[in-house]
Amino acid sequence: GSVSSARIAAEELAEKYPDNKVLVVDSLGASSGYGLFMDKLADLRDEGKSIEEVRDFAEANRLHLHHWFFSTDLTFYVRGGRISKAAGWFGTALKICPLLNMDDEGHLIPRQKIRGKKAVIQQIVKEMENHAQGGHDYNGKCFISMSACMDDARAVADLVEEKFPHLNGKVMINNIGTTIGSHT
């Protein structure tokens, strides 16, 4: 996977540029989770932390980053074998939106089945309320990833910005990309 490729690249770069350091950390994350994590690590670098201190912070804090996902379309869950055709049909008829997150090993785990887009948007923000450092006083950054659903992403971002008035800037919305989109 990505971490193995990064380790191979680090070894090749170490041979070619022996005076430079490349350290690899498995963030156990994905998509904008990587981006948010790297943004924090760049801040530490800019504060004058050594590469080893940044790596140590990354390893100690990688599980503090929360990834929550939802989908309003069950088609690809059926095609990917995650749910049966019957479950997909009934879930679609009942407007079920699965809410998932990532466990401590980076695997996607279904957590809840929620009826309706509005309800799942409310719940995903409640999850941020439950997990954000400092609760509603959270003053870090927030990234949202989406795939062809800008209106839904904007609805989540607006609610996050309303509930967390001390965010460091506006919520950043990004596309998840085809690899992550097809995997989930």
For each of these PLM feature ranges, what is it?
Residues S2-L23, G29-D39, D43-T184:
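Mixed-charge interfacial surface used for oligomerization/domain docking
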